[in-house]
C-alpha cells in the first residue's frame, strides 16, 4: 500500500478570506505483482476559509477499483468482476464551530462501477453551553447501475449531557433505510477516580 499527498496554502489580501488551500492526496493498493487493486486520488480545488471561520470547498477525484470476483453493492446490486475507473466531484460548506449553531452540507456526483452515484448530505450542531450538545445529520445516496437502481438514507442524531468533568450521558440514535432498523446507543459515564469509570 502506498499513500501520500501535498498541500499549498496562501493568504490573499482580502478582508473576508483568511486562507485558500489547494492540495492533492491519495493511496494505491497493489497485489504482490504490483498490479492495481484499488486507487484513489483526490484534489482540493480549492478549499477556502473565511475570516469568520466558515469554509467552502470543491473536490475532484479519480478512483479505480479492480474486483476479482462479482459482488453486491450495498448488499443488493450485482457488480461483475472487472477493472473500473471513474471520476467524482463534490462541493460543500461548513459554518464556523465557534458559534453555538454550526451547519454544513455537501453534494457530490461520481461514476460508480460502470454506473453513477449521487450523494447529498447535511448536518446540524447546537451547543448553547458546554454541558449540552445536540446534533443531527442526514445523507442520501442514489446508485444507478446496469443491474438496477438503489436509494439509501442514513439519519442520525446525538444528545449529550456533560454534568461535570467526571459525569456525562451520551446518546446516539441512528436509522438507515438499507437495513430498515433503528439503533440507539446510550452511555452514562461516571469516573469514580482517575483511570476508573
Give the residues covered by each predicted segment:
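Exposed, low-structure sequence patches enriched in small/polar residues
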Residues: 1-197
